[in-house]
């Protein structure tokens, strides 16, 4: 027989001071985020909105203002960095590794994750097409090439690198994962410096890589269970 809930059964009425201090001691991360929630609620409701006639405020652009000026003054350097980025982080190492885990090692999880991620990126990128950031520095060595149209939200470069790095860590390829994470960080700095992405594109790219890697893992587990049942 079920019982009706009453306020006297509320969990918080059973808390003691030891429980409160234990929360701070054993769960500092949620406590930190609780304080952060209150802080950013204050920031959000006191900050003035950016008017439609003004460019978006981006803290990443502010932090990389000097590097942006350097690249504006040196188009050759911008092209060299774009070429290195394309070959090392995106087209070269990232794509080769993710496809290689499937066709060579027989582990399709990273490939499935990348397919999930890029499909979702295409849908979201088309659904909300953000304006090109002011001061964008295109390059013929970039991917997508030159100034052709591309979706800003979210960064497929960053998300793909995260997917590859997570697979490396699962396989205990720690040195390679560290190299990929380092290159991805440098890629983030470069994309901000060239105004190729907003900060939110890059941050969500990290989260998307982790999310779709998790989705791919669940898909592979379910697919394996279905095959075993058959």
Enumerate the predicted regions with their spans.
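Membrane-interface loops
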Residues: 48-68, 99-189, 212, 216-230
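Specific transmembrane alpha-helix
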Residues: 46, 202-213
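N-terminal transmembrane-helix/juxtamembrane module of multi-pass inner/ER membrane proteins
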Residues: 4-96
């Amino acid at each position: 027989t079920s019982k009706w809930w009453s306020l006297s059964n509320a969990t918080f009425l059973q808390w003691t001071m030891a429980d409160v201090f234990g929360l701070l001691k054993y769960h500092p991360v949620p406590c930190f985020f609780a304080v952060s929630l209150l802080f950013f609620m204050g920031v959000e409701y006191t900050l003035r909105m950016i008017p439609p006639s003004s460019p978006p405020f981006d803290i990443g652009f502010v932090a990389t203002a000097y590097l942006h000026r350097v690249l504006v003054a040196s188009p050759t350097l911008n092209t060299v960095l774009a070429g290195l980025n394309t070959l090392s982080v995106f087209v070269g190492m990232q794509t080769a590794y993710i496809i290689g885990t499937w066709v060579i090692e027989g582990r399709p999880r990273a490939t499935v994750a990348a397919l999930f991620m890029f499909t979702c990126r295409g849908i979201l990128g088309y659904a909300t097409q953000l304006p090109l950031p002011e001061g964008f520095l295109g390059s013929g060595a970039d991917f997508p090439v030159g100034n052709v149209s591309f979706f800003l939200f979210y960064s497929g470069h960053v998300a793909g690198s995260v997917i590859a790095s997570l697979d490396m860590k699962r396989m205990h390829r720690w040195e390679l994962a560290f190299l990929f994470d380092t290159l991805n960080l440098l890629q983030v700095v470069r994309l901000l410096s060239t105004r190729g992405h907003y900060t939110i594109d890059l941050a969500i790219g990290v989260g998307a890589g982790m999310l779709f890697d998790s989705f791919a893992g669940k898909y592979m587990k379910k697919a394996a269970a279905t095959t075993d049942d058959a």
